[in-house]
């Protein structure tokens, strides 16, 4: 909040603009009194050039979604003129360039509804929130439902802000490419409460879904209700939560999507990744794949990743698990890194495979 207010003070009564010239994309900011402006993208910093009262930067990317950090005189700020998202437990501005993908465009068609639900969890001992997407023009009763999880450092809003999952489904429904289904998006960064203290514990999501959220939300909206009308998918950390949940409870799900995804849980018990002091997880959920009936559990088992994803070696190493256990999967490698430029098409493709 402080950074956002700081940005408003610096840029009050000003605007930031994206424009094209000679086939190149530029970001233009009005910040007359600043001495220096720069933009961080990953590990690199790009300085703006001052042109009169304006600061101009040729954007070093052409992909659709890009998290950036704007710095004014060395101070990182959030620009209210640009979209704000979050990842890796950090707030970012992001710049979205047109990529010709009509599935992510808001069009004059019927749109679904997003509902924010709150409840007190007996498992985390904390207030939890999840978001329900209800497709347009159809009653929720009897619909299939996909439980869709975000990645580390994100939240239940990520799939409908930066991810545009609801817009993608609206467009696919309008085009007649999918049958309508609902989404439930939970906060996978589960914060277990102990008195006044909280502790991140991603493992708890599985119990919360199975014991609390699924019974509660499916009773209220009358969707799902059986294995054939229920699926689960997630990206990055959410893929870990997905794999563990569907392997431990194959009787509950018929569709599985593992985006930039992992079969093994490399977070639990890892001293560099897990804030809970516990022994390394023994991957007991993977024993479900030893069951000869495993392939009959799921209509769709999609595993995918970007070709420049830093986790690609881990993904490729897990190919051996698939081969060894004889799992029938759909495997796709997309162009891109560990970001929304991969996860959006992952989701769009997966949506067209499931509940058919």
Where do the model's predicted regions map?
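Short, Lys/Arg-enriched N-terminal segments with co-localized hydrophobic residues
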Residues: 1-11
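Non-catalytic cap/lid and distal C-terminal segments of serine-dependent acyl enzymes
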Residues: 13-45, 49-356
């Amino acid at each position: 909040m402080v950074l956002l207010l700081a940005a408003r003070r610096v840029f009050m009564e000003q605007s930031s603009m994206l424009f094209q010239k000679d086939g190149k994309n530029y970001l233009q900011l009005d910040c007359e009194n600043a001495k220096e402006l720069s933009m961080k993208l990953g590990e690199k910093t790009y300085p703006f050039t001052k042109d009169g009262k304006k600061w101009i930067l040729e954007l070093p990317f052409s992909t659709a979604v890009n998290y950036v950090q704007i710095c004014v005189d060395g101070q990182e700020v959030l620009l209210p003129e640009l979209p704000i998202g979050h990842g890796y437990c950090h707030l970012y501005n992001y710049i979205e360039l047109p990529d010709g993908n009509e599935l992510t465009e808001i069009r004059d068609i019927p749109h679904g509804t997003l509902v924010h639900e709150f409840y007190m969890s007996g498992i985390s001992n904390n207030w939890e929130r999840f978001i329900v997407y209800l497709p347009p023009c159809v009653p929720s009763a009897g619909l299939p439902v996909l439980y869709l999880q975000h990645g580390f450092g994100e939240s239940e809003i990520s799939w409908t802000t930066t991810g545009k999952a609801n817009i993608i489904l609206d467009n696919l429904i309008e085009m007649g490419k999918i049958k309508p289904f609902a989404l439930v998006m939970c906060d996978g960064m589960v914060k277990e409460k102990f008195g006044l203290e909280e502790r991140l514990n991603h493992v708890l999501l599985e119990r919360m879904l199975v014991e609390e959220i699924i019974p509660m939300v499916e009773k209220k909206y009358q969707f799902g209700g059986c294995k054939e009308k229920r699926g689960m998918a997630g990206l990055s950390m959410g893929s870990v939560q997905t794999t563990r949940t569907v392997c431990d409870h194959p009787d509950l799900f018929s569709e599985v999507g593992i985006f930039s995804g992992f079969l093994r849980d490399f977070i639990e018990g890892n001293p560099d990744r897990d804030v809970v002091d516990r022994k390394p997880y023994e991957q007991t959920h993977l024993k479900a794949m030893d069951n000869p009936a495993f392939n009959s559990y799921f209509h769709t088992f999609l595993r995918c990743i970007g070709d420049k994803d830093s986790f690609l070696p881990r993904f490729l190493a897990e190919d051996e698990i698939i081969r060894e256990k004889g799992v029938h999967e759909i495997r796709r490698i997309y162009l891109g890194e560990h970001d929304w430029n991969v996860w959006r098409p992952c989701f769009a493709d997966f949506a067209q495979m499931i509940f058919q």
